[in-house]
Amino acid sequence: MNKKVILMILDGWGKSPDPKVSAIDNANVPFINSLYQNYPSAQLRTDGLNVGLPEGQMGNSEVGHMNLGAGRIVYQDLAKINLAVAHNTLAKEQVLVDAFTYAKENNKKVHFLGLVSDGGVHSHTSHLRGLIDATQEYGLDKVYVHAFTDGRDVDPKSGANYIQDLENHIANTPVKIASIIGRYYAMDRDKRWERIKLAYDLIVNGLGTPSRDAVASIKESYENNITDEFIAPVIMVDEHGKPLATIEEDDVVIFFNFRTDRGRELTEALSQQDFHEENMHKLNLYYVTLTNYDETYQNVKVVYNKDNITETLGEVLEKANKTQIRIAETEKYPHVTFFFSGGREIPFVGETRILRNSPKVATYDLQPEMSAFELKDALVPELNKGEVDFVCLNFANGDMVGHTGIMSAAILACEAVDACVKEVIEAALANDYTTIVIADHGNCETMINPDGSPNTAHTTNPVPIILVDKDIKTIHDGVLGDIAPTILELMGIEQPAAMTRHSLL
């Protein structure tokens, strides 16, 4: 075969066992429904060991795109660090040994920053517990946790329980919770520095609502209809109303999120550069991150560096002198570029990148179509030229609007995607492209939990694969790592040995 191929990723578009709770099943999506009638389809697994995560762990976009581009199962930081905690080797990692030794010898505070939940997308509470236990092995008594509440990868009001669990864990130690803030502020990734400033001012300047009871403060937020993701800054104080701890020059800071994208902005403000407009100034810190947030950072120590993934789909296409387009809106742009290329920032020879900005709204239920129509309008003319050999396209709506937990908005998101998919596939068929329609993980097919509360998290449901091609009549079930070999077979390019999964044709 010698086909031109489009990989169309409908982000967060899973297959629900219960249509009642599914935005997809409740939406009017006639075109995507017609694809199931007219073309071969099957299912892909995007969770747990199928994508290199711990068993039962829901997939996510970073992991999904990494597996898609790699053509193999890529073992993720979560699985790797879980093993280190379980086997008690975390405390023996040299970077942590050095940091704790420095703190001990210089009588400095150790601050842990990160997302306190077991969602396993950005962080895991077991890692924080392992790190805290390690500080106690070293006899450190000035240890503080700056907790970011989640409510997005886990239930919106689960934060009080996670903080209570953390308090139980540190009860008989000198370790203390120093501050609390929602991830919406501390973990922005859209250069909304006014959000990051709230987190910076909290942990550096002690600016927040003073509290002596962390769990009570979170529950108070719930009473005011503020869920975990959006909890306003809370600073923990002593009996004199003074902050228990703020981050000061020469302190040790350990950011324990293992996923890189939402740790970058706060790290930049704390350790890399001054933001004069926001009145944020970098401090001279002993700064440690669990994984490598950015190659260009100065004076940041990394506990677990990524193994380089070579011979990804992008690299194989470059070697075969094929052209490729990577196209997405801001929210998923790193996924179709950096993650799909196995952690590589630089475009391949013959690779064109098309970015459309995600709308600047507070939450995407306010604009559920996001920038899908702009993406479609940018891609269709490229397909009509018929020149590009491969396209990787991501529609973010099912995931990003699914995260709001608002069914009516997610339905509108699905309908917008359907309209855009129709135009792209019509152009694809007219210009002899084969389109593989898949998702990277589930989300908007389960908008309601069994207890009736909104579900804002990803799912472990299987996702569809539809092969839109005039000739091919069958496609098999598989995992995300099978997609790159499938694409190479369609394009008539030999699969490299490093791609250990297989084609689904």
List the model feature ranges, each with a label.
Residues 1-505:
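Feature captures the catalytic ectodomains and active-site-proximal regions of enzymes
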